Curated annotation (Swiss-Prot):
ATP binds at T65, P66, A67, G68, E69, G70, K71, S72. Gene3D superfamilies: Domain 2, N(10)-formyltetrahydrofolate synthetase (3.30.1510.10), Formyltetrahydrofolate synthetase, domain 3 (3.10.410.10), P-loop containing nucleotide triphosphate hydrolases (3.40.50.300). This is Formate--tetrahydrofolate ligase. It comes from Streptococcus thermophilus (strain ATCC BAA-250 / LMG 18311). Keywords: ATP-binding, Ligase, Nucleotide-binding, One-carbon metabolism. Pfam families: FTHFS. One of its GO terms (molecular function) is formate-tetrahydrofolate ligase activity. Pathway: One-carbon metabolism; tetrahydrofolate interconversion. InterPro entries: Formate_THF_ligase, Formate_THF_ligase_CS, P-loop_NTPase. The lineage of its organism: Bacteria, Bacillati, Bacillota, Bacilli, Lactobacillales. The gene is fhs. It catalyses: (6S)-5,6,7,8-tetrahydrofolate + formate + ATP = (6R)-10-formyltetrahydrofolate + ADP + phosphate.
Amino acid sequence: MKTDIEIAQSVELKPITEVVEKVGIGFDDLELYGKYKAKLSFDKINEVKDDKPGKLILVTAINPTPAGEGKSTISIGLADALNKIGKKTMIALREPSLGPVMGIKGGAAGGGYAQVLPMEDINLHFTGDMHAITTANNALSALLDNHIHQGNALGIDQRRIIWKRVVDLNDRALRHVTVGLGGPLNGIPREDGFDITVASEIMAILCLATDINDLKERLANIVVAYRYDRTPVYVRDLEIEGALTLILKDAIKPNLVQTIYGTPALVHGGPFANIAHGCNSVLATSTALRLADYTVTEAGFGADLGAEKFLDIKTPNLPTTPDAVVIVATLRALKMHGGVAKTDLSEENVQAVRDGFSNLKRHVENIRKFGIPVVVAINEFVADTEAEIAALKELCSEIKVPVELASVWANGADGGIDLANTVVDVVENGNADYKRLYSDDDSLEEKITKIVTEIYGGKSVVFEKKAKNQLKQFAEFGWDKLPVCMAKTQYSFSDNQFLLGAPEGFDITIREFVPKTGAGFIVALTGDVMTMPGLPKAPAALKMDVTEDGTAVGLF
């Protein structure tokens, strides 16, 4: 079997101008980055912004194994299959972060015969969005430090600066640094640190902004530090929101590429779902909804993280609500949740599938709490057996959730036809009745408690001393009505990554909060979630290379 990159490089790409004609995008609507990549102009976005939106399908998953369960692959294959059965479909995905590409993933543009192309470009620098976000973030850091160096007219307490620098790499050595060393000419020494670019609030802002003016307003509302009197300092106090918006003026425009089967794909923005809200940009999803009859999009990691945030944070910013949610499950992940060691996941174990089904069942129940119908997609792997598949289908039947096998990795659009037909049946039955888990009027404690008890299956929430003090402070500043973005391990419903399946009776501990007032939510930090990942012992980068003619090698 060919590798992902070998498959991608064997495909004869169509010019992007030709690919997007089918959804009503013309040559003058594009800002081209070569033959196969483009940004969509604001003229076109504004032209369609009042059009009636089409149907929205959200793809999510059970709690994953470290390798992931193939949400992007299923999303792409489903979109291709929907087009094949005659539904005008677009896909809206996140763009990959170079850190995980070089680290554990080795690429994140789908897999097999369900990929977005050109995958090498998408996985590396693409159209420069990550660079622009990194630059805007670090320009803010530089301007903040310069303000302090030039007299600190705002009275910023250097011990209480919460804004960090970023880089789009996994680099644990940069988590904690000291800046301003070298004497008076080089600034004032203080502790600082780096996050990965996709954890930057500017990434979240870019993905939630609806236009340039909204982007500028959100940037102005970023809290960067506190004064000596403990009042917050915003970007607007530094008067630099205009400069930051200027840096991002092209990055805010959605990127257009294609799948192997020629489905138009909007790939834009890429916040992580364990430390941010985990969804691609509102602009990309909203525009796809107005250009196509069906839009397929995804939310990062399992439904306890990405889907909850999509439904509670992103959906209120969209022109419509999801008509169906597809939960991706793999037999290997179910067996892992059923107690099987990672080394034994390729061996048949029907009982482990039954035991691990509790994880999938809870995710199904959770999505139904939002009033949205669910379809389960079994992402097929070579090691799957007929007995295991039959057991999973039987268990899904018992909780009355439709389930389809999807072999899009191996068979492309043809491997997703059954899933596409089932999704269309569910969508056209019109049973979706979306409702948020919590209201804006709920306190932060109430919102978190609802997420922990209703979605995670936990017993209660424990707030450490720092978090308790922040709750009081945030209420004084009027931030307590913002949505909550939980920063939690993706591997478990709990904050303990080793507690698999569907645990109950556990507590979730909130150690501190991070205000993301520009993005419009409050991040609650649990466990030991890192905002700057490290590299594994054998990074994917070790297998990467480029040939003399410029062909990429080793992107999975």
